[in-house]
Structures are given as structure tokens and as C-alpha cells.
Amino acid sequence: MRYWIETLGCPKNHVDSDKLAGLLVTQGYQVAESAEEADLVVANTCAFIEAAREESIETVLELAERKSSGARLVVTGCMAERYGDELAAALPEVDLVAGFGESFSELATTPVTLRRRSTPAFDLLNLPRPATSTPWAYVKIAEGCDRRCGFCAIPSFRGDQRSRSTEEILTEARALAMGGVKELVLIAQDLASWGHDRRRAGRGEAVEVLDEGGTQPLIELTRVLSQEIERVRLLYLYPSGLTSGLIETILASGVPYFDLSLQHASRRMLRAMRRWGSGERFLERIAVIRAAEPDATFRSSFILGYPGETEDDQRELLEFIEAAQLDWAGFFTFSSEEGTLANGLDHQVPAELALERLREVSELQDAITARRRDEMVGTRQRLLIDSPGVGRSVRECPEIDGIVMVEPSVAVGEFVDVTIVASHGTDLEAVLV
């Protein structure tokens, strides 16, 4: 029996697909060369915003046409969990709609009911995963989220935060290292809060807020993992979780890369989003980091057109982008999601105006990114070679940032020292030292 998995959405979904693939292998399946050659075709969907849902539906319908007549088609992931019964009724082409942790090795002929089940039937986080074909790998250290941001529906179908234990994460990290992985990219919905739910459960407490003090489990986890593998990169850091201790740990790890989930710079808009901080506080934190490590790299993401956003809020965001001089940033227009606070708010921003604001901030950030890449010309960097002729320094996260082009004869998976000789937009060109 052969399987094919088509994955949409964020890196967290890609980790889920890896775990599903590992499970299928233990059940006797082998990966197919294509969807057309598979006996089992799986679409791991995304439901974060409307555009992602549309892409997921288009992919499912495309897979239904591509698969062989005897193959079974399964839809899983966020859309399956969020719209299970509705999705099953709308897509007769699908053999099974399965939520997180649902086993589908023995397919039923009709879709299952999902909404009754609040926790997976098995532990998806700790399933085995197949060998990776790259010298880096995502490691998901927690599922779900305890925060309730006004724009985000993820907690409604991913649930509250459930952190993996240090031992479970270490076991996976060591297995990946044995397979040749040289860089771990830690991911979760709220990475900086990793471990707090386990600590609360151990003490029988209902609430603990990181901002009110106490130790931060992620600090020790990062230290331990950094002793096991050369590069440990942290993604999805909620800004209030970026404590002084965590900053020191990230800098000491040798990967001074800060992926901060800021979303806006206007304090008024951040409070409307049910989020912490302000542009001023974010700039203060960035300045502290740059004072300690001038070559630190910053990435963030921002939402344009959240309900109630004004021209003054847009101006604050533009001023912040100019002052922050981030290396990388992603911008998205607001998507009204069922079940969220923002879905029922007044003063919705017209879509065209939101797009206009997005274009304005994107143009500014593109110029900043290009300038910061130009500044790297002449510097010496240490690259991890991802594929023939393509490497990354600590400044580039796999898949989402630029690359460094090098001599294609350098072996994949090796570290090499280079000098940057040219910049081409987001990408760089280098020669071996």
C-alpha cells in the first residue's frame, strides 16, 4: 500500500504531516511517487484565513481528480477539525474527514463526526516521523494555545496549549541528529509559553501568567537542545514572553534570530486585538537585543485592516517599521473568522483600503530588507548547505527567508565559511573562504 500527503499552511502543519507519514510507515505503507500512484491520498488542510480555506478546497478537488479510481481520499488538518460534518457533506468526493489524531488506516465508507471529540484519539505530537531529506527540521514542542487573540480562531479547534515533555522533545531531536539534521526549528502557537501548562498541571493550578514572573521553561529547553545540535532556531515568540533570560539564552545559542509575533504597533489596535505591548515597548526590546548583539536578526508579522484601524494607526505602524529596521516581515490583511471577537466588531475596514495599507507597509519593508541584505556584502558568514548551491546563515530561516547561493559542489548538510560578494533582492551570493 502506498500513500501521498499534500500539506497546506504553516510549518506546524508540515510537522503533523511528517508524523502522519511516520505512522503510516509503521502500518506498512510506503510513500508514493505521486498522488496518482497512491492507494491513500491525504490532504492536510489549513483554515487560518479565508484564502487558506479556499486553497485547501481547491487542493482537495484537484486531488480527487488526480487520484486513481480505487484510491481513498482523506481530508485532515485544521479544516477537518473546524468544519468536519459540514465539510464532509459538501465534498462527496472525499472518503473520510478526519480530525487531529484520528486514525484512518482502516477507512470507513462515510465521514466521521468530529465535533464531539475535543482531544485526539492518539498522541499526534509524539508519533514517529520518517527521515528528513533536508539538514534542518521543524520540531513542534506544543499543540494548541492558551491565548485568545481577537482575530484568531485557532484555539477553538486546536484547543488549549498542551506542551510536550523535555524528554519527548529530546528523543525526537536526537533521532533527527542521528539522521543528519544540523538545525532544529522549534515551533508552537506560542513558543515562549512552552511548559507552563505542564507546570500548572503538576501544581494543580488553574492560571499562571508569564508576565507576572517566574522561571521560563523554554530557557532550559533551548540550552539543552543547543548542546545536542549546532543550530536551534526559535519561531513564533509572543513579545511578552521575550524575557531578559530568554534573550540571553537565544544569543548564547549562537542563533541570534528573533521571530516576534507583533501583529501591530499601535497600542490601541493591540488592545483591540487582545494583545500585549506597543510600538514603543517593542522598539525598546529590539534596542536591548541589538546593543548586546548588533548582528541579531529580526522577523515579524503584521495584520492590516483590523476592525477600527484608522489612518493614525497606519501611520504608527509605518513609523514603527521605519524605526525597527526589521530584517524580514510578513503582512496580511484582516480576515474575519467565525467564532472570534473581531468577527462581531463594528467599524470593519473595507477590503480595498486594507489592501492599500498592506501595499504601503510592504513597499517600505521591502526597501528595508533589501538595504539590510546589501549591508551583508563583504561580511563572512557560516552557511549550512540545504541543497546543491543553496545555503543559509543564522540570518535566514528555512522556507520563509532568503537564501545564500554558493558553489554547487559543496556537500549538502555541511557547514562552510563564505564571504558574501553580492546581493540580489532577498538572496545573497557568496564564495568559499
Language-model segments: residues:
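Short flexible coil/turn linkers enriched for glycine and charged/polar residues
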Residues: 132-135, 145-146, 264, 296, ...
